Design a protein with these regions (language model features):
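Alpha-helical residues within the helix-turn-helix
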Residues: 52, 69-70
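Residues within the DNA-recognition helix of helix-turn-helix
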Residues: 64
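A generic local structural motif
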Residues: 20, 70-71
Length: 114
């Protein structure tokens, strides 16, 4: 619902909410969120390239990429001996970038009273 639209929007169906929770839970790790942001901003990359750029060991990064791939947030494609990762679609990058931008607007370490 928007401020100038008095008609309430319908609630999301429970299955969609459950899938959204799973998607957000998978993203909710600093390495995975950074990987998704990097792939959105810079495009496809190999595990080695990502590890070097992000300062993450290849074994740890492979574990995180497997989780992202299992949830269909990234796609892996073989290119000779290398495996190249890319976002499954741009919606993933938009969600990540919006979350990062929103957090930045709120200020580091700021916690809302609730």
């Amino acid at each position: 619902m928007h401020a100038n639209d008095p008609t309430p929007a319908p609630l999301a169906d429970p299955l969609s909410v459950e899938h959204a929770v799973d998607l957000l839970a998978t993203m909710a790790h600093p390495v995975r969120l950074t990987v998704l942001s990097w792939l959105y901003r810079r495009g496809p990359a190999s595990v080695g390239d990502l590890g070097e750029a992000l300062g993450v060991e290849q074994s740890a990064l492979s574990h995180h990429l497997r989780q992202l791939r299992d949830r269909r947030l990234v796609v892996a494609e073989r290119d000779g001996k290398r495996v190249i990762y890319r976002l499954d679609d741009d919606h993933v990058g938009c969600i990540v970038e919006d979350a990062i931008r929103h957090a930045g607007e709120r200020g580091a370490g700021e916690v809302a009273d609730g």
